[in-house]
Swiss-Prot record:
Origin superkingdom: Archaea
Its job: General factor that plays a role in the activation of archaeal genes transcribed by RNA polymerase. Binds specifically to the TATA box promoter element which lies close to the position of transcription initiation.
Name of the protein described by the UniProt record: TATA-box-binding protein E
Organism: Halobacterium salinarum (strain ATCC 700922 / JCM 11081 / NRC-1) (Halobacterium halobium)
Entry keyword annotation includes Repeat: yes
Family designation: Belongs to the TBP family.
InterPro entries in UniProt: TBP, TBP_archaea, TBP_dom_sf
Keyword Transcription: yes
Any one of the GO BP annotations: DNA-templated transcription initiation
UniProt-listed NCBIfam families: PRK00394.1-2 (NF001593), PRK00394.1-5 (NF001595), PRK00394.2-2 (NF001597)
UniProt repeat feature Sequence, residue ranges: 10-86, 101-179
Annotated transmembrane regions: none
Record-level Gene Ontology MF annotations: DNA binding; DNA-binding transcription factor activity; general transcription initiation factor activity
Length: 186
C-alpha cells in the first residue's frame, strides 16, 4: 500500500506582496506587454508568467497577489519576474519585498474507497460538513494544522488553507490515523 503522503501534489500556491505605492493600472497595462486590464470585469491588472506558470493580480494600491504556482519556489520566482518588469517601467520596487504565502492547495490519495456517511458520523458533526445532495465531498476542518480537507468517496483528498507544504503532510497523517482509529480505513 502506497503511503498517502507520497501522493501529495501541490495544485496551487497563493501568495501576497506589495510594492508600497499606488499604481496607475491603465498606464502600467499599456506599457507592460501581455498585461490584461479590464476594470469593468476585475479591479486588478492580470500579468501572467510562463516559466514558472502563474498569474499576478496587481492592484491600484500596489498590492500583488500571485496565484497558480505549483510550489513556493515558483511563487517567489514569478514575483521576482513581476518586480523586474515593474522596475523596467521605472516603478520603484524594493530589493526584496516581503512575500507571504496565504494558501497552499494540495491533493492526495488514500488509495481506497471511503464510506463518507460512516466517516461523517465517526468524526463528529462539530468538525465536518457533509451534505451529499449539495456537494459530493465531506468537508473536514482540522485545528492543527489549521486546514480544511475535502474527502471524496474515491479516497481522493483536497487540502486547502495550508501555509507551508508540510501542513498537507501533517493533515494527511492526522486524517489517516483518525480514520484508522475509527476502523474506517480497512
Amino acid at each position: 500500500m502506497t503511503d498517502p503522503k507520497e501522493t501529495i501534489n501541490i495544485e496551487n500556491v497563493v501568495a501576497s506582496t506589495g510594492i508600497g505605492q499606488e499604481l496607475d493600472l491603465q498606464s502600467v497595462a499599456m506599457d507592460l506587454e501581455g498585461a490584461d486590464y479590464d476594470p469593468e470585469q476585475f479591479p486588478g491588472l492580470v500579468y501572467r508568467t510562463q516559466d514558472p506558470k502563474s498569474a499576478a493580480l496587481i492592484f491600484r494600491s500596489g498590492k500583488i497577489v500571485c496565484t497558480g504556482a505549483k510550489s513556493t519556489d515558483d511563487v517567489h520566482e514569478s514575483l521576482r519576474i513581476v518586480f523586474d518588469k515593474l522596475r523596467e517601467l521605472s516603478i520603484k520596487v524594493e530589493d526584496d519585498p516581503e512575500i507571504v504565502v496565504q494558501n497552499i492547495v494540495t491533493s492526495a490519495d488514500l488509495g481506497r474507497q471511503l464510506n463518507l456517511n460512516a466517516i461523517a458520523i465517526g468524526l463528529g458533526l462539530e468538525n465536518i460538513e457533509y451534505e451529499p445532495e449539495q456537494f459530493p465531498g465531506l468537508v473536514y476542518r482540522l485545528d492543527d494544522p489549521e486546514v480544511v480537507a475535502l474527502l471524496f468517496g474515491s479516497g481522493k483528498l483536497v487540502i486547502t488553507g495550508g501555509k507551508e507544504p508540510k501542513d498537507a503532510e501533517h493533515a494527511v497523517d492526522k486524517i489517516t490515523s483518525r480514520l484508522e482509529e475509527l476502523g474506517l480505513l480497512d
